[in-house]
Amino acid sequence: MELAKKIGFNLKQARKDKGLTQKQVAYKFKMTQQQYSRFENGVFELNYQQIIQLCELFEITPNDLFLVD
């Protein structure tokens, strides 16, 4: 699995673990649900600032996003 898709998968799991919807997360980051969905689907890659902000929101570390099974 390519890295962007794996990060997206881990992002989705972290969001679900927090009980949040894509729409709720997108609202916090001032983007549409469709835009946020592209991160979870590995279509768009996250920049450093986005990674840090999402990790803070989901209470995970950047390493958690990059873990590959």
Name these PLM-found stretches.
Residues 16, 27, 56:
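Alpha-helical residues within the helix-turn-helix
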